[in-house]
Amino acid sequence: MKILVIGPSWVGDMMMSQSLYRTLQARYPQAIIDVMAPAWCRPLLSRMPEVNEAIPMPLGHGALEIGERRKLGHSLREKRYDRAYVLPNSFKSALVPFFAGIPHRTGWRGEMRYGLLNDVRVLDKEAWPLMVERYVALAYDKGIMRTAQDLPQPLLWPQLQVSEGEKSYTCNQFSLSSERPMIGFCPGAEFGPAKRWPHYHYAELAKQLIDEGYQVVLFGSAKDHEAGNEILAALNIEQQAWCRNLAGETQLDQAVILIAACKAIVTNDSGLMHVAAALNRPLVALYGPSSPDFTPPLSHKARVIRLITGYHKVRKGDAAEGYHQSLIDITPQRVLEELNALLLQEEA
């Protein structure tokens, strides 16, 4: 059986979608699974053994471009896929499998995609509370799976593969010392500072960890580089020698390898949080207005700290810097306690 998956366009969603690929492979061991997704996803997909080929989606996230999608679909016809699974909810994301003439096209209804999909699922958000459950449900016939309780347990969570050789090579590439174990911080998050733990809290935690004998490495995109510099600036000269701001300095694949080399990770609700979970790193995840009830880190080594409940549609925080009060209220001491408990568990 040949399967085409139209993958998501965000790091976190792409990571969670691996649970679907793992489930499909477990159900259909002979299946060949290709994933069409933005080209930047390739470093993640190449580390998922279930994925045969990452096919770059050449069209932008917001572009409809029906003519181009038709051409793209027609170019896939020779691959003779048997099934397609469409993970994004947009109308346009269902066009390529339709134009490719794939006989069985499965997905949630999303933007009224009757016709484009011929195996349409209607989402009951209460029956399927977690994003990962919604992905995995598509691997089964809709008559069988009425709620998340019907899914076989345990779910096959995301797992990325990184070798020891890659870790030492990439640490050397970035001149990261092997003298001290690394703790990774992921201080960025989409949609600005409202989902971010304040930089001054990260700085306070970094001071304590460096004084305890760790080195701290900051990860993120170029957009997070300034937040990293703010953390760095709050440290004294001796401490700065043991804190590296790699936000915007690494390719995604290098960040994956370096996160795998970390002893533990402290992170906001972000795509890199899901990467760290898939690498089975002990991690402390800090949530504010966004809710872990929908997209928690999928790992037994994750601890979530959140001081409020429910979902708050807040793109802007309360404080002058745009931080959300519920994240300001999470103290560095509390995070350090959770982190130390995880590190003790890991050593045991």
What are the residue ranges of the model-derived segments?
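Catalytic machinery of carbohydrate-active enzymes
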Residues: M1-A348
